[in-house]
Amino acid sequence: MAENVTIARPYADAAFELARGAGALGPWSEALDRLAAAAADASMKACISNPKLSADQLYQLFIDVAGQGFTPELQNFVRVLVDNERLQMLPEIRDLFVELKNEHEGVQEAEIASAFPLDDATLANLKADLETRFKTRLNTKVSLDPELIGGVRIAIGDEVIDASVRGKLANMAAALKN
């Protein structure tokens, strides 16, 4: 995986610089999402590794599947990936691009795992409290994890806040063993 990130980084950096220069970080991010989803599809993976498909055919396939409304710069970016046989790196390129975009915009990703669904008001309050604590804007991704029993577990960057019943029980068990 680290090797993939090393290979993907120059492409992500180039995409970010192009997007920032054009003032189009949002559209590039959406385009990379579509391209990464296409590259991760099993049938598209088979096409990428099929030696019978020419570079032109592969390029046209990706443009047809994910490239509706692409600017000439985005089309050229896809062409570079095809020519350098890097289409399989699109998920990593997208992830690195999002990191660069978030850093540029002063935003961090927050992953919130909850034992039960959070209503919009609760999520908005939690997000506001976290933004105040971390002094940054947050993009939140919420997932359900019934194994938490109750409460939430929040991961922002390298920091994890475990306010779940399962986490408290684990801490209690560790304290009793000592």
UniProtKB/Swiss-Prot annotation:
<keyword id="KW-0066">ATP synthesis</keyword>
<dbReference type="InterPro" id="IPR000711">
    <property type="entry name" value="ATPase_OSCP/dsu"/>
</dbReference>
<keyword id="KW-1003">Cell membrane</keyword>
<keyword id="KW-0472">Membrane</keyword>
<dbReference type="GO" id="GO:0005886">
    <property type="term" value="C:plasma membrane"/>
</dbReference>
<keyword id="KW-0997">Cell inner membrane</keyword>
<dbReference type="GO" id="GO:0045259">
    <property type="term" value="C:proton-transporting ATP synthase complex"/>
</dbReference>
<comment type="function">
    <text>F(1)F(0) ATP synthase produces ATP from ADP in the presence of a proton or sodium gradient. F-type ATPases consist of two structural domains, F(1) containing the extramembraneous catalytic core and F(0) containing the membrane proton channel, linked together by a central stalk and a peripheral stalk. During catalysis, ATP synthesis in the catalytic domain of F(1) is coupled via a rotary mechanism of the central stalk subunits to proton translocation.</text>
</comment>
<dbReference type="InterPro" id="IPR026015">
    <property type="entry name" value="ATP_synth_OSCP/delta_N_sf"/>
</dbReference>
<dbReference type="Pfam" id="PF00213">
    <property type="entry name" value="OSCP"/>
</dbReference>
<keyword id="KW-0813">Transport</keyword>
<keyword id="KW-0375">Hydrogen ion transport</keyword>
<comment type="function">
    <text>This protein is part of the stalk that links CF(0) to CF(1). It either transmits conformational changes from CF(0) to CF(1) or is implicated in proton conduction.</text>
</comment>
<dbReference type="GO" id="GO:0046933">
    <property type="term" value="F:proton-transporting ATP synthase activity, rotational mechanism"/>
</dbReference>
<keyword id="KW-0139">CF(1)</keyword>
<protein>
    <recommendedName>
        <fullName>ATP synthase subunit delta</fullName>
    </recommendedName>
</protein>
<comment type="subunit">
    <text>F-type ATPases have 2 components, F(1) - the catalytic core - and F(0) - the membrane proton channel. F(1) has five subunits: alpha(3), beta(3), gamma(1), delta(1), epsilon(1). F(0) has three main subunits: a(1), b(2) and c(10-14). The alpha and beta chains form an alternating ring which encloses part of the gamma chain. F(1) is attached to F(0) by a central stalk formed by the gamma and epsilon chains, while a peripheral stalk is formed by the delta and b chains.</text>
</comment>
<keyword id="KW-0406">Ion transport</keyword>
<comment type="similarity">
    <text>Belongs to the ATPase delta chain family.</text>
</comment>
